[in-house]
Amino acid sequence: MTGESWKLKGEAKRQSILNAIPKKWRLECPVPPATELRDVTADYIRQYLTEREIEITETDAVAIVEQTSTGRWSAVEVTEAFCHRAALAHQLVNCLHEVFFEAAIKDAKQQDEYFANHKTPIGPLHGLPVSLKDQFHVKDVETTMGYVGWINTFQGNQNDPRSGTEESELVRELRNLGAVLYCKTSVPATLMTGETINNIINYTWNPKNRLLSSGGSSGGEGALIALRGSPAGFGTDIGGSIRIPAGFNFLYGIRPSAGRIPYQGAANSLDGQSTVLSVIGPIAPTARSLMLLFKAVLGQKPWLYDPLALELPWRDEVVQETREWIEKARDGASTLAFGIMKYDGVAPVHPPIARGLRIVEKTLQRLGHRVIKWKPPSHAVAIELLDKVFNMDGGVDLKYHLGLSGESRAPQVLGTEHGTPMTASEISALNVAKREYQKLYMDYWNSTAEVTGTGRPVDALFCPLAPHAAVIPNEYESVGYTGFVNVLDYTSLAIPVTFADKKVDVRSSNESVDGSEHIKWDYDAESYDGAPVGVQLVGRRLQEEKMLTLAEYLGKEIAQDAKERA
């Protein structure tokens, strides 16, 4: 395919997305440029909505289900409201790859009919619109994963019988639970970057500051949910791709350990690579929404349908135990302990991130919890291991899928195109090195029992999600803050904290990080002004119930302190 032809094919696909939006929902007047209007959330997008649509779309997933499962709100009304707001969101920041609003409204009508006939909801997600990253196959809906060469194919394969008929396991389970599926969101081609850019929709911008990135690779999910065009959605994460967009868009997002949420039947990059597995998790404006979706999916027993899913049901007893620890801490009878890592020894953080961590630390101290400085095994080792995983095939996967159309590669994309694939022996050695690093980190975590004062190791770790807030395009410096979690296969959540403020977040040119001087440190307070700032809550492997419970508790407390210090 020539340069002109792949561009035309991408443009045609881009136009088809807009054409799928009903005319009544298309913006008649052009949106002011980002230099004149950075923030298109809240009042800006609300001007195109009715009061009823605003009420529905600014309600979180838990409260929506409380309404739809009792018949107070119809599934159709809720679905139409989110379809409208999603259509607006796409026209503001380029966040959608696929819209199937008509099919969604048809499904919602069937749900309303079911409720009218049976006086009971279909499932725990009855009537809840759920958005999906464009890796999940949905019947009669295309999956491009950002590749021009995947348009009108099944994962790049022409005349594949699965085209239009295949559904990912998670999609099947969401339907069983009563969720209404209505759109798929933008991703970067290859998935290998902390920004979202491809040759179909171009760049997905940050709704709070349209001069900045929405993150990646689940950047479309982050942007859509930030604009409340979705109450909750599912992304994937191999190096930070759930947590980065969540943090960049002032949202919660969980990266669970591998095997808890079914990946069966989803498209992927580097498919078959198993040294560091990509995982699926939800993104939402509230921690309790994550818990709702996570618990609901596990209730479908995914281990019966996905050979890599663990037979590990939702553990209410862990939630209860964690809540008891929280109550004891409130009463002064006991305390929780947290590590705080402000700098990983590789990428010094910008002032908004440093301030966000100070807010978190002060919140923990106000609540009476123990806080210790985190001194783990070298994170540079984890970054090196992850880099080897990303380049394991020497760029074969990347070159093949870009080569289907001959399209150009975005400069942000990680990975080599001209490497040598690793041999079986080299992959084995990499797996051993990863295991040894995991053991070192495990031993260090255990050793913190000697300094917490609780007799236990730390309950969780707080650290940055990235060196910066929502980033300037093509300036994402390091995935080290999120990537080490993937190497360890730990549970991790993004928690929103505050927003960058050019009047507050300033720094002298000679200021050091943890007493060390660093040569490279680029920060422009004006450019980052208004950018969302999130932090990362990290737990040990398979601690999803505990971390979600802590996130719900601490997220509210952190938000309170951030508001008081604003």
Where are these regions (language model features)?
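An N-terminal boundary/leader segment
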Residues: 1-113, 362, 366-369, 560-566
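Short helix-loop capping/hinge segments that flank enzyme active sites or metal/cofactor-binding pockets
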Residues: 42-52, 126-152, 211, 327-341, ...
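A short helix-breaking turn/cap at a secondary-structure junction
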Residues: 44, 255-355, 404-408, 560-566
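Glycine-rich, small-residue loops and helix-cap segments
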Residues: 71, 127, 133, 176, ...
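Residue-level signal for inorganic ion chemistry
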Residues: 82, 104, 290, 338, ...
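Conserved small-residue hinge/capping positions at short loops/turns
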Residues: 114, 118-145, 180-187, 364
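Glycine/threonine-rich flexible loop motifs
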Residues: 142-161, 350-351, 470-476
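Short glycine/serine-rich loop segments
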Residues: 168, 172-298, 490-496, 534
